[in-house]
Amino acid sequence: MTWRTTRTLLQPQKLDFNEFEILTSVIEGARIVGIGEGAHFVAEFSLARASLIRYLVERHEFNAIGLECGAIQASRLSEWLNSTAGAHELERFSDTLTFSVYGSVLIWLKSYLRESGRKLQLVGIDLPNTLNPRDDLAQLAEIIQLIDHLMKPHVDMLTHLLASIDGQSAVISSAKWGELETARQEKAISGVTRLKLRLASLAPVLKKHVNSDLFRKASDRIESIEYTLETLRIMKTFFDGTSLEGDTSVRDSYMAGVVDGMVRANPDVKIILLAHNNHLQKTPVSFSGELTAVPMGQHLAERVNYRAIAFTHLGPTVPEMHFPSPKSPLGFSVVTTPADAIREDSMEQYVIDACGTENSCLTLTDAPMEAKRMRSQSASVETKLSEAFDAIVCVTSAGKDSLVAL
């Protein structure tokens, strides 16, 4: 196993690129690189991500960043990124969840792009992370009026059926989905299916009369709504404790499709994915033997140009999502929680033995590893780490990001 310590990983403005040359063999030939995090809302992970973004952009010419949010959410963030609006105005272009997850990285990114003169494309590779279909429905209503006006009343009907699904997180939105009558849920799902099949059936005719970009956007919004409704159903059962093994894979399948489609359609794109380790890994996600999910990374692993870099830490605590939290607009609060114990067969113990505990450590999984577990949130994920990730970044602690007011 190849490894080295780094002193500047958490100093993106003063980065020593020589410390990152260990990653060159991993990144060469890649067009998709996932930069993970073992938990959301961690200050050190945001700093380390900023450093790796700099490295990938300046040394390997990556030109796009994908976020765990919907396309419309990302378009608003992109508007802010390319405007004269200051850091203090980011919340006006964002929602509470996206700001909490990505605020620190985005504020750094805006400053970096301004000072360096570089340009980066910002895209949403996910469903709306609120699982609120309102924005997708609104955009679809505008487009369908132009490309298939006979279906505009149908979209309006869907908007009415789903009007109460207006949460700011999956916790809230899935609960509101559960409050809908079963007949209303089924009518919404069948309504989206009808739209999808009609658009596909009429595609040769519709494409002759409308801008191809409009048709693609309509198809994209319908697909997003379809996956969102199924994910709402799944998350309701997940929070109720009645979901089936692997159910949450639906969202990961969607993300993989978006990324794969983008890279195939744009041969010059080289994209950095900022997502949780559990979405990026190239093996099934499991915490105690059961199948939790087939992650996005396992789908993307079928491409020879995908790489996954995980983040973990050695700290005694980690920010964790605590729910229910009725006073929070997201239905959960972020609480500093004891991290899972570092065990003999863990990645964290390997780092301690190899690199010590004083500095951050970069490790390539270029040889079989005895480590078969790694911290994830306040637990540990169990997998063959040398198959799951191409490299693993370990920082010494995991503190709550100062921008997170949850």
Curated annotation (Swiss-Prot):
Erythromycin esterase type I and type II share no significant homology except for the region from AA 270 to 300. Gene3D superfamilies: Biosynthetic Protein domain (1.20.1440.30), EreA-like (biosynthetic domain) (3.40.1660.10), EreA-like, domain 2 (3.30.1870.10). Transmembrane segments: none annotated. GO terms for molecular function: carboxylic ester hydrolase activity. This is Erythromycin esterase type I. Pfam families: Erythro_esteras. This enzyme confers resistance to erythromycin through inactivation by hydrolyzing the lactone ring of the antibiotic. It comes from the Bacteria. Keywords: Antibiotic resistance, Hydrolase, Plasmid, Serine esterase. The keyword S-adenosyl-L-methionine does not apply. Its EC number is 3.1.1.-.
